[in-house]
Regions:
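Short aromatic/hydrophobic "clamp" motif used to bind/position activated sugar donors
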Residues: 75
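Short, well-formed alpha-helical segments that are part of the catalytic scaffolds
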Residues: 12-25
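Conserved donor NDP-sugar-binding/catalytic core segment of glycosyltransferases
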Residues: 87-115
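Active-site donor/metal-binding and catalytic loop motifs
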Residues: 176-194, 203-207
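Non-catalytic, C-terminal membrane-associated alpha-helical segments of glycosyltransferases
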Residues: 195-202, 206-259
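A conserved acidic beta->alpha catalytic loop
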Residues: 32-41, 79-82
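Acidic donor-binding loop at a coil-to-helix junction in glycosyltransferase catalytic cores
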Residues: 156-165
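Glycine-rich, basic loop-to-helix element that forms the pyrophosphate-binding segment
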Residues: 54-70
């Protein structure tokens, strides 16, 4: 068995079953039932995973609890609605021989024109070599270097952004393998813009808690225009136009929470 625990928070997505089936290595699997539905609970308990339960959804708390009850020295954070491509787990685990953190790539599925635009927009947000999850693997020994905690449970929806800030501040090296990939199902416009709204809420909470790296958005119109020009040149009109609405949703989420 690899010295690795895969931590998967699960709430209401029955695709957890496909996620579990995509695990192609002998590893410890920890499923944290994050205020989960009965259907998701049945899927989890019918597997060979170590099960933890939280009464109400809190992704950061689910990550922390999963890490706490895991028994291996290394953890791999995964989403319940995604699946591993063959070899991904082993690729990320091997990277940990040379560094404390390892990151792979999220591939966003699409079956429609708008789905393709959303997938491209998501790629822009997730292609950087940072400590956002998933797929993110790291050694538990980094704890002391990231201020003594992994994920801030007060920061819903932006807990990995805060984690990345502390990782970067500690000058911890993040190793990256573009071939270590997971597949994310297609997102609808409603789902994606709701996520953007929630990221805005999470960012506002970071500002209210005076977290490093969180800032009050200023010059919103200028920011939208500058982003549009850059993205249009690099990715095309459709993606740039869509991301205007994405940014507006983010700002609305921020405004709702900050007031």
């Amino acid at each position: 068995m690899l010295n690795l625990s895969i931590v998967i928070p699960a709430y209401n997505d029955i695709r957890l079953g496909k996620c579990l089936k995509s695990i192609d290595e002998n590893v410890e699997v920890v499923v944290v039932l994050n205020g989960a539905t009965e259907e998701v609970k049945k899927i989890a308990y019918s597997s060979n995973a170590v099960i933890g339960e939280l009464p109400t959804p809190n992704l950061a708390k689910a990550y922390n609890y999963g890490i706490e009850i895991s028994s291996k020295d290394n953890v791999l954070i995964m989403d319940s609605d995604c699946v591993f491509m063959p070899g991904t787990i082993n690729k990320l685990f091997k990277l940990l021989d040379a560094g404390s953190l390892a990151k792979g790539r999220v591939m966003f599925s699409f079956n429609s024109k708008i789905g393709k635009i959303i997938a491209r927009a998501r790629h822009i947000h997730t292609c950087k070599k940072n400590a956002y999850s998933p797929p993110l693997a790291f050694n538990k020994g980094i704890l002391a270097k990231v201020n003594g905690y992994y994920f801030d449970e007060n920061l819903s929806w932006t807990e990995d952004y805060d984690f990345d800030i502390r990782v970067q501040s500690a000058s911890l090296k993040i190793l990256y393998d573009d071939n270590a990939r997971i597949i994310h199902p297609e997102l609808s416009i409603k789902q994606d813009l709701k996520s953007s709204f929630n990221y805005g809420v999470g960012h506002a909470r970071g500002v209210l808690h005076k977290k490093n790296g969180y800032y009050e958005p200023k010059n919103k119109t200028r920011s939208i225009i500058d982003s549009y020009k850059y993205i249009k040149k690099k990715y095309g009109y459709s993606t740039a136009f869509y991301l205007i609405f994405w940014q507006i949703a983010f700002y609305r989420g921020y405004k709702k929470e900050i007031h």
